[in-house]
Amino acid sequence: SYVNGDETTMEPLRSILNNYQDDFTPSIRIEYVDNSIDNLLATSASNTKWRFNIQSLFQSVNGLDNGMLFVIGARSNVGKSSFHSTLCASPHGWASQGARILILCNEEKPERVASRYMTAATGMTMTQIAANKAQAHRLYDPIKDNIKFVDATGKTMRWAESVIKTHKPDIVVLDIGSKFAEDGAATQDPAVLKANAVYARNIGKMYGSLVVYCTQLSAEAEGKIVLSQAMIEGSKTGLAGESDLMILIARNPPLQDSTDGDD
């Protein structure tokens, strides 16, 4: 009992009272960031741990680091998953650099996304892979175990956090990021989508993962090759404001005299 307790037994209660004195404002213990020259130089040098394997990107940005939020935006069927499969699985990509990568798929079937990763790693079509499995194994097997795919259909960002906390990937791909929103995949509320982006960014910082957040662009981006962050579906500036890097992907419109078979 604290009523007749001695100094030792009263200490827990005394700490509580001291922390909540002055109109119950708690005293907060904080840790200061090391702002020494050596630490800031070391931190700056590690900002590009995961290098881009696309030369034009590498020349502009070099790469990204754990704890960052990287947004990829495009219209449907323009190439979001093909783009991140290239960054992750193609030669000299993040898997080849040693990253442990987790792909959370809530749009396409995970097997379809995994097939894109396999073709990116091998440089072969599915037909070519079927005809020459030995070559496919030689090219794909060295990185296969570094990349894991999970069906995340109907899951929330809270669920994604639990998975990331448990499995501790270096890189996690949210495909599609906005569909992890707590209010459901169909929400167009900018405040909800911004909160979802903040949550994704915080997950990356808390667990030391680079978060790749794929998102759809609105109908305003249809047929255009010059894109802007204002074209992100439902998000306005919230998602852009949270991102460390955003890349929007466009597809050149077909020429007037092209046929359906033209690329």
Region locations from a protein language model:
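Short, small/acidic-rich helices and loops at N termini and domain boundaries
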Residues: 1-34
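The Walker A/P-loop phosphate-binding site
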Residues: 24-123
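Amphipathic alpha-helical transducer elements in NTP-driven molecular machines
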Residues: 51-54, 111, 136, 157, ...
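Cytosolic-facing regulatory segments adjacent to core modules
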Residues: 59, 95-168, 182
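Structural motif
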Residues: 71, 171-175, 212
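Phosphate-binding/switch region of NTP-binding enzymes
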Residues: 73, 77, 196-263
